[in-house]
Structure formats: structure tokens, C-alpha cells
């Protein structure tokens, strides 16, 4: 028994040493501007010989019928507010798609959209939101509407300030992106989504990655086993991104649009928070979009099995991770500060311009700033 305990102790010490060595080597690579993330992903996927399948829709095994029980199970994973929900709508003239909260008074004589007096839904005194029903969920999953007007979106932030899931959104929400179902304009977003997936895996989280209905965007879903305070969930999400910034060398994260829930609590102006379109949209699924995908970006054949087998995180897990990451970040900062004090002349803070993209404008506070290039070429003003 004593020998077993000693062996376990030795193995634990060896594991700690390897983890420390691993972190040191990662820091060296980061300082040198070398990315280990892509190589790590290649090694992890080397065991899989399956290449990307161009026939994504045909990969999916569609159930013969979507039952009410399946709809209930589906909503238990994507549990948003039940007293209000949104549906997709396409403008016949512009072709732009948008999601609107469903109201019992929509387009009646008291509806401000019909009156066109500029009053928003959240400020409308005649507002009467519809509650989500099993029929709405079934229509979403079946996808019988030719223009996908049966697609629904939910509001993750519940009225009591909790949420049952979080999602990282990699869709394009720039101006006029609605015309192409919020599709991204190039393929850089794919690398960023893979980075987000890798960040989760490196930290013991099994996310569910969904390719958006456009086929050129994604959502990274994380589920909880019970409602958790939204402010704490957002704290966890930001801590996860901070930790990921230490682990993965990525030039930019420009296609990461937002994290939902997007607020710590509901605002007092009767707003319902931000919405997210739900996956497994029947019509888009026929093309392999709005589908859950693996590391090779292939749609899982059995979408339902993949969804229901995805583990849900507990609040205790979130608490442990935040504590763990806080200690790690504090230790690294303390060690860096100590090194600066001991041998400041031997330490250089390296900056590699290839590690970042874009421009940074720095303006001195309480100073005079004139953003006018002609100022330097025009004749000097006279007294």
C-alpha cells in the first residue's frame, strides 16, 4: 500500500514537472511568434482519415418524423425564455433576413410597424409577446416553409437573470450582411472557430460547433446542467477567452462577433436581450448547414445523438476553472514582474508585428489632437 502511494506521488510530481515544462515551452514559442496551434490540431486529427465531404447534406441521417418528445428534448438543450421568442422573416423587396419578436398585435391597427411612427417594439404600450409552443419548435425542426420563415430564435437570458447555455457567435453582423444570411466574406473565420474549439478542449470543455445556415459562419455552444447566473457565466466566458489568449497564438479574432448572453442582467427598459437563431433548421439541414460539425468540418451523420450526448457543465466546474485560471494568470504575472526587477537589463519585451493585424491609434489624454493630414502640408498660420 505504501509503495502504491509513493508511486502515485512520483507520478503526480512527474506530471506537474511536465505541465510546467509544457507551459514554459509554449511561452517561448509565443515570444518567438511561432504558432503551435495549427501543428497541434494536425497531430490530433492525424488519426482521422476522413477528408471534408462536399456532399454535407447527404451525410446526415434524417429521422422519419420529428416527434413532440424530440422537440421537448431539443428545447431542453436550448432553453431560452418561453414568454417571448423570435422568428425569421425575409423582406420581399430587399431580400434581407431579420428576426423579430412575435407579438399578438403584429400588423394590427395598434402596431407601430404598420403605423410607421418610429416607435420600437420595446417601447410599445400595446406590446403582447407570444409564448413559444411545441408547434413553433416542430415547425423549426421540420423546415417546411419555402423561405425558412419557420426558423426561430430564442433569448438566452432568462427573466430571472440566469441562463442554461452560452454561445460564441462567429457570424457576420456587419451592415447589409442580412442579404446573405449573415455569411462571412472570406475563410479566415474558419481558423478562428477552430481556435475557439481548441481553447475549449485544452481547458476540459467539450463544445458543440454548429455551422450556420449560411454555411459561412458558426456558433460554438456550451451547455449547463442547471440555470446559472448570467453575470457569472459571462465572467467565465471572458476568463476562458483570456486563458485561450495565453494558449493559442492567433493574429486576430475579428470574426468573433459576440458572446451570449450578451448582458449580465435584463435592462430596465423592458428589452428582452439578444437573441440567437437555433440550430437544426429543417430546410438548411438538407444542405448540411445549421448542423453540428466535427473537427474536419463534416456534419455528424446522427445530429440528434451528437446533441443529446454532449455533456453539460456544472456551476462547480465553472467556479473551479475561474479559480484555476486566476491563479495561473496571477502566477505568470508575478514571475514576470520578479524577473523584471532582478535582471531588467537581460530581459526584453518582444513584439512581433506579424502577430497582429490592423491599426492602433493612441491619443494623449488632455492634449491637443487634430486628425488632419493637411495640417502638415499647408503653410503655417500667421499671427
Regions found by a protein language model. Give the residues of each.
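Intrinsically disordered, low-complexity linkers and terminal tails enriched in Pro/Gly
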Residues: 37-66, 326-350
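Conserved small/polar residues in nucleotide/adenosyl-binding loops
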Residues: 376-383
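Signature for HUH/AEP ssDNA processing cores
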Residues: 2, 57-216, 223-239
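DNA replication initiation modules
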Residues: 151-190, 194, 225-368
Amino acid at each position: 500500500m505504501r509503495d502504491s502511494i509513493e508511486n502515485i506521488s512520483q507520478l503526480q510530481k512527474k506530471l506537474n514537472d511536465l505541465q510546467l515544462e509544457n507551459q514554459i515551452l509554449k511561452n517561448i514559442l509565443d515570444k518567438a511568434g511561432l504558432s503551435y496551434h495549427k501543428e497541434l490540431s494536425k497531430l490530433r486529427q492525424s488519426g482521422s482519415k476522413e477528408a471534408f465531404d462536399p456532399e454535407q447534406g447527404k451525410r446526415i441521417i434524417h429521422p422519419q418524423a420529428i416527434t413532440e418528445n424530440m422537440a421537448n428534448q431539443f428545447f431542453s438543450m436550448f432553453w431560452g425564455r418561453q414568454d417571448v421568442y423570435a422568428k425569421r422573416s425575409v423582406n420581399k423587396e430587399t431580400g434581407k433576413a431579420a428576426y423579430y419578436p412575435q407579438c399578438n398585435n403584429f400588423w394590427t391597427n395598434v402596431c407601430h410597424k404598420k403605423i410607421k411612427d418610429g416607435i420600437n417594439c420595446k417601447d410599445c404600450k400595446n406590446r403582447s409577446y407570444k409564448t413559444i409552443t411545441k408547434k413553433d419548435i416542430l415547425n423549426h425542426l421540420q423546415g417546411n416553409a419555402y423561405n425558412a420563415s419557420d426558423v426561430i430564435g430564442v433569448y438566452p437570458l432568462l427573466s430571472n437573470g440566469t441562463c442554461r447555455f452560452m454561445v460564441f457567435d462567429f457570424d457576420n453582423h456587419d451592415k447589409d450582411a442580412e442579404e446573405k444570411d449573415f455569411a462571412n466574406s472570406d475563410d479566415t473565420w474558419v481558423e478562428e472557430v477552430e481556435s475557439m474549439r481548441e481553447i475549449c478542449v485544452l481547458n476540459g470543455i467539450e463544445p458543440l460547433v454548429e455551422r450556420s445556415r449560411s454555411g459561412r459562419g458558426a456558433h460554438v455552444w456550451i451547455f449547463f446542467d442547471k440555470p446559472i447566473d448570467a453575470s457569472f457565466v459571462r465572467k467565465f466566458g471572458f476568463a476562458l477567452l483570456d486563458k485561450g489568449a495565453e494558449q493559442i497564438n492567433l493574429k486576430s479574432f475579428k470574426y468573433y462577433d459576440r458572446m451570449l448572453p450578451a448582458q449580465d442582467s435584463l435592462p430596465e427598459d423592458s428589452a428582452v436581450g439578444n437573441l440567437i437563431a437555433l440550430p437544426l433548421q429543417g430546410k438548411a439541414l438538407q444542405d448540411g448547414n445549421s448542423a453540428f460539425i466535427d473537427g474536419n468540418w463534416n456534419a455528424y451523420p446522427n445530429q440528434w445523438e451528437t446533441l443529446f450526448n454532449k455533456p453539460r457543465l456544472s456551476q462547480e466546474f465553472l467556479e473551479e476553472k475561474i479559480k484555476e485560471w486566476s491563479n495561473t494568470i496571477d502566477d505568470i504575472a508575478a514571475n514576470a514582474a520578479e524577473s523584471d526587477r532582478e535582471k531588467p537589463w537581460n530581459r526584453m519585451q518582444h513584439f512581433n508585428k506579424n502577430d497582429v493585424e490592423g491599426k492602433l491609434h493612441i491619443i494623449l489624454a488632455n492634449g491637443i489632437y487634430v486628425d488632419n493630414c493637411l495640417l502638415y502640408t499647408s503653410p503655417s498660420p500667421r499671427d
